[in-house]
Amino acid sequence: MVPKTIIEKIWDEHVVYREDGKPDLLYIDLHLVHEVTSPQAFEGLRQKGRKVRRPDLTFATMDHNVPTINRSVVEDEVAKNQMTALERNCREFGVPLADLNSPEQGIVHVIGPELGLTQPGKTIVCGDSHTSTHGAFGALAFGIGTSEVEHVLATQTLWQHRPKTMQVNVTGSLAPGVSAKDVILAIIGKFGVDFGTGYVLEFTGDVIRRMSMEERMTICNMSIEAGARAGLIAPDDVTFAYLKERKYAPKGEAFEQAVEKWKQLCTDEGAVYDRVVHIDGSEIAPTVTWGTTPAMSSPIDGTVPDPNEFATETERKAVQLALQYMGLKPGTKMTDIAVQHVFIGSCTNSRISDLREAAQIVKGKKVAPGVRALVVPGSQQVKKQAEEEGIAQTFIDAGFEWRDSGCSMCLGMNPDTVPAGEHCASTSNRNFEGRQGKGARTHLVSPAMAAAAAIYGHFVDVRTLYKEVVR
């Protein structure tokens, strides 16, 4: 038998129909739905007189547009209409929905794992680019467009071109204060925003294996920012322990049988990737983006680069335009960049471990004058747990705003935005022009780095604040 990568194993297991020179027809195990990319898809079914083929393999929630302060009032008409439409569509087509009043509501890429819907070996799709998050469980998960959402609703299948495979091997150990967010920013910073184009990435190596499931989700979440179709990590005992007793995960003997099957989901010895890249985790520092792509970043002890340092005219122009938008000058120390806003949240970094990491920095301190700081849990379950652990009170005592769950300030399509010309330390995944609001200047960082920026009013090296043992 020819050795296979885990990517090839999952793909081949789900091919319904294959024809040379054409896309494969894949079976989809889990379809996650939210209010923004689904209305037209459901309307398409309605117009054609079709039903949702597998409502039992479909799960919906409201996240992108939801208010995070007063949920009883949705002032934006577009947002209100989208949420009303999702509620109506789920009721009509029999799709389970975690609405604003549900204790299971949250960001779709947070609740999928915490409810146990996300499982190793599954094909998972959602009308959202950061569906790659679920790859942390050894699933093949990727975002799709609205027309594809309709196709999956109607057929539980999807036409897809077979991707190339890439191993991203992260060796060594991380220093205290260096997080999964720093690892993925360092990878993108080293190899670029398009090095993964046409590939599914498998993250391997000692650094990855030592990570918790929530750290692995951060890594896979930003695979798309490297241009990849998806990213995944082979499941192991960490994965199985996380899933045990989750609401929708198998129970009892069925769980043990599932684990035995999941253990086969690994890349065979001798399997050949289309490409292999390496990065030494020991060399990674806390990282801050200074530009308008996730690749435009520097270690915290670095400086804003000079456009003239770049090799090509295209690169020089891109850096020049980015610095102009960000209002930064070459040579500025990263620690001298002041922030007016801090956002701890998003599908990248809003889980309980992220909030614990940030609270550790914040405890006993106060938010700096002139800084507005928000903490937005990724789900109502995360919110409840943080409140029970006293983490929420730590943030409140420090002067942070403590919110309900939702996508919030990650994207400028709800009430939580950053004013033009102001800088935000954000634990989200994208720093494009206008991402957090028209003219907003976004710096991507880890939860610890964001928390420290809130306290000091500028970026600081969190390694000086940590006294933990090296992972």
Curated annotation (Swiss-Prot):
SS bond partners: none
Annotated residues for binding of [4Fe-4S] cluster: C347, C407, C410
Presence of keyword rRNA-binding: no
Homology family: Belongs to the aconitase/IPM isomerase family. LeuC type 1 subfamily.
Cofactor (UniProt): [4Fe-4S] cluster
Assigned keywords, A-Z: 4Fe-4S, Amino-acid biosynthesis, Branched-chain amino acid biosynthesis, Iron, Iron-sulfur, Leucine biosynthesis, Lyase, Metal-binding
UniProt cross-references to NCBIfam families, sorted A to Z: leuC, PRK05478.1, PRK12466.1
HAMAP family in alphabetical order: LeuC_type1
Organism (species): Anoxybacillus flavithermus (strain DSM 21510 / WK1)
E.C. designation(s): 4.2.1.33
InterPro entries linked to this entry: 3-IsopropMal_deHydase_lsu, Acnase/IPM_dHydase_lsu_aba_1/3, Acoase/IPM_deHydtase_lsu_aba, Aconitase_4Fe-4S_BS, Aconitase_4Fe-4S_dom, IPM_dehydratase_rel_enz, IPMI_cat
Origin: domain of life: Bacteria
Enzyme class: lyase
PROSITE patterns per record: ACONITASE_1, ACONITASE_2
Reactions catalysed according to its record: (2R,3S)-3-isopropylmalate = (2S)-2-isopropylmalate
Pathway note: Amino-acid biosynthesis; L-leucine biosynthesis; L-leucine from 3-methyl-2-oxobutanoate: step 2/4
Protein name: 3-isopropylmalate dehydratase large subunit
Originating gene: leuC
Stored Pfam families: Aconitase
Function: Catalyzes the isomerization between 2-isopropylmalate and 3-isopropylmalate, via the formation of 2-isopropylmaleate.
Complexes and interactors: Heterodimer of LeuC and LeuD.
GO annotation terms (biological process): L-leucine biosynthetic process
UniProt-recorded Gene Ontology molecular function terms: 3-isopropylmalate dehydratase activity; 4 iron, 4 sulfur cluster binding; metal ion binding
Cofactor binding notes: Binds 1 [4Fe-4S] cluster per subunit.
